[in-house]
Amino acid sequence: VQEPSEPDCMLGIGKGYQGKKATTVTGTRCQAWAAQEPHRHSIFTPEANPWANLEKNYCRNPDGDVNGPWCYTMNPQKLFDYCDVPQCESSPFDCGKPKVEPKKCSGRIVGGCVAIAHSWPWQISLRTRFGRHFCGGTLISPEWVLTAAHCLERSSRPSTYKVVLGTHHELRLAAGAQQIDVSKLFLEPSRADIALLKLSSPAIITQNVIPACLPPADYVVANWAECFVTGWGETQDSSNAGVLKEAQLPVIENKVCNRYEYLNGRVKSTELCAGHLVGGVDSCQGDSGGPLVCFEKDKYILQGVTSWGLGCARPNKPGVYVRVSSFINWIERIMQSN
């Protein structure tokens, strides 16, 4: 499969820049990273930095220099110089339409399967300031993420959190991954388990970063609709830990879910249930706040925010999700006034 050519541009300071620019701002040719002529150097060699993709003589930013990508130069009088790499522009987008077709495995996330990289491009990783992943979330516009309120219990200060977009691996971030600080957070006023995060700068919309669609207000998902939950959460098979997983889950109508043998009246009208009544599949911790999306006509619509479940993938105990359609008026009001 031919990768669509990435535009030759950088995000932020270009730490993840993987383009082919090979001249400095003054037009001087770059020295190959593996070469020792005209300049001898030992720190930024491909051997010393296998993860930095120091290939040929392309500009790179292996040390996270605030001035952006650079290279050693072919001018014997000048050791290194910066390169003129433009910032990436956002692409126009249709919400809920991935550029990479999802696998849609009917496996069971404790069951689930590993997702195809970037096939759920609205999935975000909510992290501590130090980069530790602890919850999921969903990009719903370039500047806004929806997550679970209980994910924000550790602190009410936005500076405590950051959002990672466009990554498949929890630890090894993809080249085009974006890390953006949170500038504001809003908890739903009636204490529902849902919250909005405003990003400090808009996400750049790329083929790996695309918002999900929101449902119409008060929309009720059809029983047994084709819905998927995604996340990096705990799985029984820990060999796949750290990569994004998906599971297809049927939605179960509230009156069935609230029967005595299932969740026995605990599910509110502003919540929805999804899961296999025989158990075995479910989203689990670490996927709190993440998306439950349902495919309709030609796009994925965010219908649920992962909230709670009794145990993990136990028979007769489906997972419970906040019903996004119950909060559309609140979501739109906050987004418009901030």
From Swiss-Prot:
Residue pairs linked by disulfide bridges in the UniProt entry: 9-88, 30-71, 59-83, 95-213, 105-113, 135-151, 227-294, 257-273, 284-312
Single GO term (MF): serine-type endopeptidase activity
Modes of activity regulation: Converted into plasmin by plasminogen activators, both plasminogen and its activator being bound to fibrin. Activated with catalytic amounts of streptokinase.
Catalytic activity: Preferential cleavage: Lys-|-Xaa > Arg-|-Xaa, higher selectivity than trypsin. Converts fibrin into soluble products
Site residues (Site of substrate specificity), renumbered to this chain: 282
Site feature (Interaction with streptokinase) residues: 157, 191, 269
Subcellular location: Secreted
Gene Ontology BP terms: blood coagulation; fibrinolysis; proteolysis; tissue remodeling
Main localization category: secreted
Residues annotated as catalytic: 150 (charge relay system), 193 (charge relay system), 288 (charge relay system)
Positions of the Kringle domain: 9-88
Family annotation (SMART domains): KR, Tryp_SPc
Annotated EC: 3.4.21.7
Note: Plasmin is inactivated by alpha-2-antiplasmin immediately after dissociation from the clot.
Protein name: Plasminogen
